[in-house]
């Protein structure tokens, strides 16, 4: 088994495997992912019989950790073609990626697995459960609250609002920036979703997700 990090021009070659393994993802979302995320991520792959048969993606994030900034990678899109499973490809990819991140001085990495048990043998442990706030068109809102669909022009204000909220409540979180929300708006739109902004007296008081029903009921986490 040979594992290697793909060159920028090779990353698109993993799209076929992604579409095959993550068939529940819409075409528009996959197109978004391969247009946007491949700009700055890393992809490790195993090639056999002339094709990529397994892969692991490292998507970069800037985290706030006890008041300090840390550049870390989010492990995602770990996949092996069905006919090539149980050959140790996933373990090999994880070990290679973890060793490389350690060598680069990265303090830690994180992922949001479909099943916790898959990653326990690699010393991953649950540190938190993700809670998302969803928009309900039938909910009663406080008098004076105005709800609008988020657009790129709102991204800077959204980032400032969420940074203030997260700083007060969490020791570890993904840093919010204008670019973060511009990308997130585009990401939700790719799957038919919208971010809703709640404002009172001209100031943001909340941000919620308006998404398809299956996403609300426990679909894939956003990346």
Describe each PLM feature range.
Residues 43, 72, 107-109, 195:
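Beta-sheet entry/capping signal
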Residues 75-85, 114, 214-223:
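A short, internal acetyl-CoA/4′-phosphopantetheine-binding micro-motif in the GNAT/acyltransferase core
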Residues 129-223:
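Amide-forming acyltransferase catalytic core, primarily the GNAT-like/NAT-type
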Residues 45, 51-61, 74-79, 197, ...:
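Conserved beta-strand in the GNAT
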Residues 77-80, 86-99:
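Conserved acetyl-CoA-binding loop-helix of GNAT-fold acetyltransferases
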Residues 1-3:
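Extreme N-terminal starter segment of soluble prokaryotic enzymes
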Residues 21-64, 171-194:
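Active-site rim helix/loop that mediates acceptor-substrate recognition in acyltransferases
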Residues 103-107, 113-131:
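Conserved active-site alpha-helix within GNAT-family acetyltransferase domains
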């Amino acid at each position: 088994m040979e594992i290697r990090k793909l060159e920028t021009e090779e990353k698109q070659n993993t799209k076929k495997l992604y579409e095959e393994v993550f068939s529940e993802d819409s075409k528009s979302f996959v197109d978004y992912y391969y247009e946007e995320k491949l700009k700055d991520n890393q992809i490790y792959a195993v090639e056999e019989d002339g094709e990529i048969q397994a892969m692991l993606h490292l998507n970069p994030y800037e985290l706030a950790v006890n008041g300090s900034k840390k550049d870390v990678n989010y492990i995602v899109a770990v996949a092996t073609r069905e006919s090539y499973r149980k050959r140790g490809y996933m373990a090999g990819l994880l070990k290679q990626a973890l060793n490389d991140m350690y060598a680069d001085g990265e303090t830690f990495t994180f992922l949001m697995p479909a099943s916790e048990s898959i990653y326990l043998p690699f010393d991953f442990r649950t540190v938190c459960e993700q809670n998302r706030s969803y928009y309900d068109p039938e909910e009663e809102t406080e008098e004076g609250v105005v709800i609008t669909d988020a657009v790129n022009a709102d991204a800077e204000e959204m980032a400032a609002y969420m940074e203030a909220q997260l700083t007060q409540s969490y020791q570890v979180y993904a840093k919010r920036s204008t670019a973060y929300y511009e990308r997130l708006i585009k990401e939700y739109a790719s799957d038919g979703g919208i971010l809703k902004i709640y404002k009172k007296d001209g100031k943001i008081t909340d941000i919620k997700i308006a998404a398809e029903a299956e996403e609300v009921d426990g679909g894939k986490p956003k990346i």
